[in-house]
Curated annotation (Swiss-Prot):
Its EC number is 2.7.10.2. A lipid is attached at residue 2 (N-myristoyl glycine). It comes from Xiphophorus hellerii. Residues 92-153 form the SH3 domain. This is Tyrosine-protein kinase Yes. The gene is yes. Residues 159-256 form the SH2 domain. The modification Phosphotyrosine is found at residue 427. InterPro entries: Kinase-like_dom_sf (IPR011009), Non-receptor_tyrosine_kinases (IPR050198), Prot_kinase_dom (IPR000719), Protein_kinase_ATP_BS (IPR017441), Ser-Thr/Tyr_kinase_cat_dom (IPR001245), SH2 (IPR000980), SH2_dom_sf (IPR036860), SH3-like_dom_sf (IPR036028). One of its GO terms (molecular function) is non-membrane spanning protein tyrosine kinase activity. CDD domains: PTKc_Yes, SH2_Src_family, SH3_Yes.
Length: 544
């Protein structure tokens, strides 16, 4: 938000859908392992398969620089561990939990802990933050629930990544530094109750690539990839294939490094926070309505802080919208941590180390990216927007300046929903330098009809920003000229070096009738499969 300065089988994605964007979302993203056990009416002792490994942002969503999605807190590879020396259930039937990551306390009520520490859960009714007793130290305090799992459960295994899509799996396994034989196990996207073994491979034809093997479950509880070799547990299956190729493309050698996820919220009960708890450290940028800072919360935690000029929006309206925004949890959305709700309003979010996508493309490492990386970034943005679409929400200001980048080309959508609250007369009149005319669908710019379909139009403009490395849309045209020409049917021509098939997707996004524009679900599917289904013969050029 701000001033504009000049393959497993997947079900078919729905290409078109009517707009119903006036519905307010009532549910949040539940995360990779299903709902919290408290929502399902379970006690901690019963919590063995549901949401005990990282939720919502796992394993993509680490704090930017150095903890970033696709990077990982632990850069060293870990050998496979099959047996845990400590039993999960001690006398009395109490389930013990084990820490999956290190955590440094952010408040006096938190517990610091190290990966492998064990806990007894005292109270898990809060969902995101549990009261626990450390078995290692005997101390009581709060811990982030997505940092622990029941001891000896599958969720506590290094190699188990839970509900991770095939595409995100390949992004992780193909990161630089991973070698042939790097692997993970995840839930199957297509078969309920089954798992997938995903493995990094190499051959002369494809180079580095990933293979995926379905792990099926027997009625007696066993597991197999092929029926001739069956195992009583997933742990035994993993152990076998680390010792024997036995039909796989390569032996399992190293576990794919996990990424420390974002906690859900900055701390327990830290939502409306005092201004004094924030320190503004480095100003990262400024726009018409405020500034963005790298800062520190409570002297312990690096965050991003957006400061809004007084009068930009009503504090009451902002707080109401922020309550919705904080429930929109997805690994391709920048999480909202906390707010200062009195003017000047402060918005506290995850810090993303590479800054905005626009700056990254124009002045950062993005200048040197080729089409495969740019299309992958676009597919990540479409993934986040498809979630916003499912939640019946609207962004209203989708453009490269409002996408943030972390290490390893991870993209997250920022500032969703804020544009609706701006009270500046020049902005609300949808004219002048403060309003992003060049990114806005004609029905929204002319008549104020903002829907998810106007977001689709904006996404088409964002695609041009990606392939031109941050060029301002409609070069050589002023805002009024853009409005007039677009209303008459003008559309930007295919950018230099851009494949015609990608330009055709842009043109689909720019259909005059909103309901004729594709859904974000369809756009995501198109982009994720682009180099297998649409442009399999792609060869790198000078620019793309």
């Amino acid at each position: 938000m701000g001033c504009v300065r000049s393959k497993e089988a997947k079900g078919p994605a729905l290409k078109y859908q009517p707009d119903n964007s006036n519905v307010v979302p009532v549910s949040a993203h539940l995360g990779h392992y299903g709902p919290e056990p408290t929502i399902m009416g379970q006690s901690p002792a019963m919590k063995t398969q549901n949401n005990s490994h990282p939720t919502a942002l796992s394993p993509f969503g680490g704090v930017s620089s150095p903890m970033t999605p696709f990077g990982g807190a632990s850069t060293s590879f870990t050998s496979v561990t099959v047996n845990n020396p400590f039993p999960a259930v001690i006398t009395g039937g109490v389930t013990f939990f084990v820490a999956l990551y290190d955590y440094e306390a952010r408040t006096s009520d938190d517990l610091s802990f190290r990966k492998g520490d064990r806990f007894q859960i005292i109270n898990n009714t809060e969902g995101d933050w549990w009261e626990a007793r450390s078995i290692n130290t005997g101390e009581n305090g709060y811990i982030p629930s997505n940092y622990v799992a029941p001891a000896d459960s599958i969720q506590s295994e290094e190699w188990y990544f839970g509900k991770l899509s095939r595409k995100d799996t390949e992004r992780l396994l193909l990161l630089p530094g991973n070698e042939r034989g790097t692997f993970l196990i995840r839930e199957s996207e297509t078969t309920k109750g089954a798992y997938s073994l995903s493995l990094r491979d190499w051959d002369e034809t494809k180079g580095d690539n990933c293979k995926h093997y379905k792990i099926r479950k027997l009625d007696n509880g066993g597991y197999y990839i092929t029926t001739r070799t069956q195992f009583m547990s997933l742990q035994m299956l993993v152990k076998h294939y680390t010792e024997h190729v036995d039909g796989l493309c390569y032996k399992l050698t190293t576990v794919c490094p996990q990424v420390k996820p974002q906690t859900q919220g900055i701390a327990k009960d830290a939502w409306e926070i005092p201004r004094e708890s924030l320190r503004l450290d480095v100003r990262l940028g400024q726009g018409c309505f405020g500034e963005v800072w790298m800062g520190t919360w409570n002297g312990t935690t690096k965050v991003a802080i957006k400061t809004l000029k007084p009068g930009t929006m009503s504090p009451e309206a902002f707080l109401e919208e922020a309550q919705i925004m904080k429930k929109l949890r997805h690994d391709k959305l920048v999480p909202l941590y906390a707010v200062v709700s009195e003017e000047p309003i402060y918005i506290v979010t995850e810090f993303m180390g590479k800054g905005s996508l626009l700056d990254f493309l124009k002045e950062g490492d993005g200048k040197h990216l080729k089409l495969p990386q740019l299309v992958d970034m676009a597919s990540q943005i479409a993934d986040g927007m498809a979630f916003i679409e499912r939640m019946n929400y609207i962004h209203r200001d989708l453009r490269a300046a409002n996408i943030l980048v972390a290490d390893n080309l991870v993209c997250k959508i920022a500032d969703f929903g804020l544009a609706r609250l701006i009270e500046d007369n020049e902005y609300t009149a949808r004219q002048g330098a403060k309003f992003p005319i060049k990114w806005t669908a004609p029905e929204a710019a002319l008549y104020g009809r903002f829907t998810i379909k106007s977001d689709v139009w904006s996404f088409g403009i964002l695609l041009t920003e990606l392939v031109t490395k941050g060029r301002v849309p409609y070069p050589g045209m002023v805002n009024r000229e853009v409005l007039e020409q677009v209303d008459r049917g003008y559309r930007m021509p295919c950018p230099q070096g851009c494949p015609e098939s990608l330009h055709e997707m842009m043109r689909q996004c720019w259909k005059k009738e909103p309901d004729e524009r594709p859904t974000f679900e369809y756009i995501q599917s198109f982009l994720e499969d682009y180099f297998t289904a649409t442009e399999p013969q792609y060869q790198p050029g000078d620019n793309l």
